[in-house]
Amino acid sequence: MINDVKFCAILTMRYINKSLMQSCHDNIDAHMPPPPKGLIAMRSFHISPDRGMSIFYFDTNENLNAAFPSMKEFQQYVAAKFHAKADAQKAITSSQSDFGEC
């Protein structure tokens, strides 16, 4: 088991028109803001042809809370531009249930 806790932002996107996903990725690559303070890792996932998810890991809850509004704002901008529905959540990893490193 892993003993340290990570503070996370989980951002999801569902594209109304799944053919826009690659254009959206290209736009994000070109316009991604600099990494926020305390960001230690990010993992992105394709869930289905029209859905994606990214998990951002922060070192402290304070850094997550400071970064979350601007992350959400950027996500909403992208969702509006590429006809998608976005959701953002905060989470804390479970040191009791974690296993391995990714």
Regions found by a protein language model. Give the residues of each.
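Short S/T/G/P-rich N-terminal loop/turn motif that feeds into the first structured element of a domain
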Residues: 1-53, 59-73, 80-102
